[in-house]
Amino acid sequence: MAEFDARDLLDCYARGVFPMADAREDARVFLIDPERRGVIPLEAFHVPRRLARTVRGDPFEIRIDAAFHDVVLACAASGPGRTETWINRPIEQLYLELHELGFAHSVECWQGERLVGGLYGVSLQGAFFGESMFSRVRDASKVALVHLVARLIAGGFTLLDAQFMTEHLAQFGAREIPRREYHRRLDRALAAPADFYALGAAAPSADGAGRLALQLITQAS
């Protein structure tokens, strides 16, 4: 892995494969191209009713790329129901390099100056590859996901790759598709330009950001 750098990782994403590790302290990294892939259709993203009320109330200040490394570390930390993580130190470093190059981003939920939840992923043309999320208070990662989807819709993205299908993601409309179909969608997304900062860069969200996010999602459906 010593010669494998961020540019190599970008090439992997463009081919439809992504990195994983068995544990935080295991330095080995392997690449995955699942037979079935989890995706979240942006045009069919579902916001559960209770979550929509929460988002509309703007319980968190949403920041973009303000504390990327802290988000990755929080996602890599063990917690209730998660004793191990696939984010080892070589993978952590690769994502930091991608962030420096402008390809990896975080959506963060803040209460005052406390980071309480968020997610991060990789942006490449019209595709966004969601990597991991975390919450320190109720609904924080879910709110971050809603704001991510709104940002992707505004920026002209066509693919949100969730990697693996989970019951948690199913509530938002995620579904599983065969590898061949995934690669077709990926090829189309990579041929389309998109702008992750269409809703603005690293400035904190303004009042009404939740309503705007829900409006963008509704208009796309």
UniProtKB/Swiss-Prot annotation:
Recorded GO MF terms: leucyl-tRNA--protein transferase activity
Catalytic activity: N-terminal L-lysyl-[protein] + L-leucyl-tRNA(Leu) = N-terminal L-leucyl-L-lysyl-[protein] + tRNA(Leu) + H(+); N-terminal L-arginyl-[protein] + L-leucyl-tRNA(Leu) = N-terminal L-leucyl-L-arginyl-[protein] + tRNA(Leu) + H(+); L-phenylalanyl-tRNA(Phe) + an N-terminal L-alpha-aminoacyl-[protein] = an N-terminal L-phenylalanyl-L-alpha-aminoacyl-[protein] + tRNA(Phe)
Alphabetical list of Pfam families matching this protein: Leu_Phe_trans
Residues in coiled coil: none
Predominant localisation class: cytoplasm
Keywords, sorted A to Z: Acyltransferase, Cytoplasm, Transferase
SUPFAM superfamilies in the cross-refs: Acyl-CoA N-acyltransferases (Nat)
EC number of this enzyme: 2.3.2.6
Location of this chain's protein in the cell: Cytoplasm
Alphabetized InterPro entries for the sequence: Acyl_CoA_acyltransferase, Leu/Phe-tRNA_Trfase, Leu/Phe-tRNA_Trfase_C
Listed GO CC annotations: cytoplasm
Gene Ontology BP annotations: protein catabolic process
Domain of life: Bacteria
Residues spanning the membrane: none
Signal peptide: none
Family of this protein: Belongs to the L/F-transferase family.
UniProt xrefs under NCBIfam families: aat
Protein purpose: Functions in the N-end rule pathway of protein degradation where it conjugates Leu, Phe and, less efficiently, Met from aminoacyl-tRNAs to the N-termini of proteins containing an N-terminal arginine or lysine.
Protein name stated in the entry: Leucyl/phenylalanyl-tRNA--protein transferase
The encoding gene: aat
